[in-house]
A protein has these predicted regions:
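Long, structured protein-protein interaction/assembly regions in large complexes
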Residues: 3-223
Length: 223
């Protein structure tokens, strides 16, 4: 009943009302409020708006394709931006494993490839303490640019959400429960992204472009 009542009194924030809310949030700076409201209008109700320091004297918006998942920092040692407490990876390769990675040997060829190609690596998987410690040590030493996050979703939704992330990034998920062998982890199953930013609560993965597989999956979900 409470939900029904709240639904009945809600006010959808759009158009001029959105402009007003954004302006008020900027201490009545009309110009900045307009920029923020236009950003929200552009991405829609399912989009995500992030604010970052501009590299120029201008304040502007940039629309990128991507996704936000509820997977935050798993270790303070993985943070690259201490001011904002974020782990930022540029042009990362992405490894998605639904089963726990028990030792570094299982991903040795991937790590060697990442280092050789001078790329960064986002690992989306449960990992043993041994693996996490080894990766953190090599990250701190500057040997590799890496971040580790948990699998997205909770309980029954994890498998479906992980599948969506794989489609989005072009990765192949390795899952022992579905008969996959961890020894099958190779560079051929890696996905990639333009950027991956992880803060204390979420990870935002942005892409260079949206593939047809992603478009098809979006249509499937909407239907």
């Amino acid at each position: 009943k409470i939900n029904d009542y709240l639904e009945s009194i809600k006010i959808n924030v759009k158009d001029d009302l959105l402009d007003n809310v954004a302006t008020i949030s900027c201490n009545n700076d009309v110009k900045l409020g307009k920029i923020i409201s236009e950003a929200y209008k552009s991405v829609g109700k399912d989009g995500v708006v992030l604010m970052e320091e501009s590299e120029t004297d201008e304040t502007y918006t940039e629309i990128v394709d991507g996704v936000q998942i509820e997977c935050g920092i798993t270790s303070p040692h993985l943070i690259t931006d201490t001011d904002k407490q974020r782990a930022v990876l540029e042009n990362p390769l992405i490894l998605i494993v639904a089963s726990e990675i028990p030792n570094v040997r299982k991903i040795q060829n991937v790590l060697e490839h990442v280092i050789k190609q001078n790329r960064s690596l986002l690992i989306v998987a449960p990992v043993s303490q041994q693996v996490k410690a080894a990766l953190i040590m090599n990250k701190v030493k500057g040997n590799i640019k890496v971040n580790i996050i948990d699998l997205p979703g909770f309980g029954p939704t994890t498998q479906e959400t992980t599948k969506d992330l794989a489609i989005l990034t072009g990765a192949t998920v390795i899952n022992e429960e579905l008969g996959d062998d961890l020894d099958a982890i190779s560079i051929d199953i890696l996905g990639e992204a333009e950027k991956a930013v992880t803060d204390t609560k979420n990870t935002v993965i942005t892409l260079d472009d949206i593939t047809q597989d992603v478009e098809d999956r979006i249509d499937e979900v909407i239907k």
